[in-house]
């Protein structure tokens, strides 16, 4: 039996019943009880490090390169992220690439550089774990362990992520429904890790003008269905830098708890995803506009 994922408010409006009655009826059959707002009505707030929270009133700005390439590149990016008001540095040490001939990341050296950037600039770190073998190594450095879109339904990795004591950022799969996405989160929660955030990074559609299609409607819908924080990655969603800032602003307006933006000191020289990376000045310009939008929807940055 497949549950119909209709927000309680919409069910109530259609049926004329009370919200409490709807919750009671549906909580017993919701397929993802640990992730469900019907079972857990209060928003989850995840502490990444002292003073850095994901899911509270403050929208969390995250910036950094697709891949860690060198110490100079990462330190310049980390400094720009901190100066712009970002609280989290993203950067891939291990990169799952479509082509086996593409740059795959620096591996353990990339983790060392991320740890150096954290200590130097006071930023929290988000980076991806690609498999069970590398999960423990990544968790030693990351304040937020990313599970990428390709691994959203890697159930052995999800189970392992449930056993670590690090927050997890779970990206939506390329063709995943909201139910599949939330069920993937349920694997981590069921393993004992209560600190899970979701990341909308675009889905595959018939559109060819962008890399993916950013499903912004998923943000308010998932926040109705679930108590978990929701982050938006406008870089992978669009694949082209002129669209990143507008979609980041739209994400904040839609209620996202964080935005994850790819930036690079020299996007034209990036070893991966240069076309969707903002330059450091462009990132600063974007960051300056986000507080205005956040305040309009009752949030801060």
Which positions does each model-derived feature cover?
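Glycine-rich, proline-tolerant flexible connector loops at the mouths of alpha/beta enzymes
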Residues: 90-108, 265-277
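N-terminal active-site wall of soluble small-molecule enzyme domains
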Residues: 96-142, 146, 154-157
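Alpha-helix-loop-beta-strand connector modules within alpha/beta enzyme cores
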Residues: 103-127, 161-167, 216-230, 276-299
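Conserved anion-binding
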Residues: 93-97, 150-217
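Active-site mouth loops of central-metabolism enzymes
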Residues: 59-74, 99-104, 124-128, 149, ...
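Glycine-enriched alpha-helix->loop->beta-strand junction motifs that scaffold or abut catalytic
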Residues: 85, 137-146, 162-168, 189-195, ...
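Non-catalytic terminal accessory/regulatory regions of metabolic enzymes
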Residues: 1-54, 58-61
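Hydrophobic faces of well-ordered beta-strands that scaffold small-molecule active sites
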Residues: 60-65, 87-91, 125-127, 145-147, ...
